[in-house]
From Swiss-Prot:
Its EC number is 3.1.11.6. InterPro entries: Exonuc_VII_L, Exonuc_VII_lsu_C, OB-fold_nuc-bd_dom. Heterooligomer composed of large and small subunits. Belongs to the XseA family. One of its GO terms (molecular function) is exodeoxyribonuclease VII activity. This is Exodeoxyribonuclease 7 large subunit. It comes from Synechococcus sp. (strain CC9605). GO terms for biological process: DNA catabolic process. It is an enzyme of class 3 (hydrolase). GO terms for cellular component: cytoplasm; exodeoxyribonuclease VII complex. Coiled coil: none annotated.
Length: 387
């Protein structure tokens, strides 16, 4: 190509042309995964280098946007940047203008592990420190974003399960660099737990990415939760999400709704349980009444048997029985049947012939009198013979 056919530019024209190409040929918005290096604040703007280890590019967050960010990166943080390209034609400088910056999952997990290890070594994270939850709390504080679907679900669940419990809803931001705000709110509530009659606190946030839950890994926030004056229940994110706040809480629930379920009894189950306990108590009392009644009856019988009148009646009955026995055994009864009672002159009974001899005087007593007789003859009975 001849020199007269080549496009000719001044430096300014070349840089302007490059800028125009970038504006027309590159996406107006893009996501950039990078690691932050050497962040510096200059005149309210945040300047930094974004690198992936093999390449780097300058980045900037203008002061107006910096104030709106929920997260401000530190040196070495992995981040996801929502950005656009800025090209300064005067010096052919290419910079990523960050519209939003969020920590990458690797950064969030690294911070989680760091705080967890520190608190475990100090004994702040220790199962033995966990406190039991109140069985039927009269009042609990609920800290979450307002309005939110998580709050709506919690309020509905509380009304269905145990409407007697008062829920004091305290709005808080739940994402970004908001740990100081949450800490201030928690400290204010802690000073009024007795005044408000609070028996537990729920810290809740609905679903989102693990990166969105990074605030609940804040070390100062977690130390405050671990030493809170009332039991703390967390319901943060999804079931698979785990934050340091979950580890220091007295109870970790999988979701915000599950946190309410953990704190409040089920009124239908309680009603059934009350009915069963009432039935058991009724059976117990009835059994006791029957036993006491039988015991009183036994004592009444015993006292009746020991009374003088009863003793006299028993003795009288014994005398009647003995009299009847004596009457049945009386000789008079046998004499009336034709038998006689024989005795010698001395009055001794004659049991048999061996007690008399010829000439003895005998007295024969009969039913209607007696007579005297003399023995003239003794005739023994013939002995029994066996064939």
């Amino acid at each position: 190509m001849s020199a007269d056919r080549l496009p000719s530019y001044s430096v300014a024209e070349l840089n302007t042309a490059i800028g125009s190409l970038l504006e027309r040929g590159f996406a107006p918005r893009f996501l950039l995964e990078a690691t932050v290096s050497r962040p510096q604040l200059k005149k309210g703007h945040l300047w930094l280098t974004l690198t992936d280890g093999s390449a780097s590019i300058s980045g900037v967050v203008w002061a107006s946007k910096l104030a709106q960010l929920s997260y401000q990166p530190k040196d070495g943080d992995g981040v996801t940047v929502v950005g656009k390209l800025n090209f300064w034609a005067a010096r052919a400088s290419l910079t990523v203008q960050a519209l939003d910056i969020r920590p990458s999952l690797s950064t969030v997990l690294r911070d989680f592990e760091r705080v967890r290890q520190v608190l475990e070594q100090e004994g702040v994270i220790d199962p033995s420190r966990l406190r039991p939850l109140p069985s039927q709390p009269a009042s609990i504080a609920v800290l979450t974003s307002v309005p939110s679907s998580a709050l709506a679900d919690m309020l509905r669940t509380a009304a269905e399960r145990w409407p007697l419990t008062q829920l004091i809803v305290v709005p808080i931001p739940v994402q970004g660099s908001v740990a100081p705000t949450i800490i201030n709110t928690l400290e204010a509530i802690a000073e009024r737990t007795a005044e408000l009659g609070l028996q537990a606190l729920v810290l809740a946030r609905g679903g989102g990415s693990r990166e969105d839950l990074a605030v609940f890994d804040n070390e100062a926030l977690c130390r405050l939760l671990a030493n809170y004056p009332i039991p703390v229940v967390t319901g943060l994110g999804h079931e698979d999400d785990l934050t340091v706040a979950d580890l220091v809480a007295d109870h970790r629930a999988a979701t915000p709704t599950a946190a309410i379920v953990a704190l409040l009894p089920d009124r239908e189950a309680e009603r059934q349980g009350l009915t069963q306990r009432q039935s058991r108590l009724k059976d117990t009392l009835l059994g006791r009444i029957l036993r006491e009644r039988q015991r009183l009856q036994d004592r009444a019988v015993a006292l009746q048997q020991q009374s003088p009148r009863e003793k006299i009646m028993r003795k009288r009955q014994e005398l009647i029985q003995k009299h009847q026995l004596l009457k049945a055994l009386s000789p008079e009864r046998w004499l009336k049947r034709g038998l006689a009672l024989i005795s010698n002159k001395a009055g001794d009974p004659i049991p048999g012939l061996e007690s008399v001899k010829i000439g003895d005087q005998l007295n024969i007593r009969m039913s209607d009198g007696s007579l005297e007789a003399r023995v003239d003859q003794i005739q023994p009975s013939a002995p029994n013979t066996t064939s």
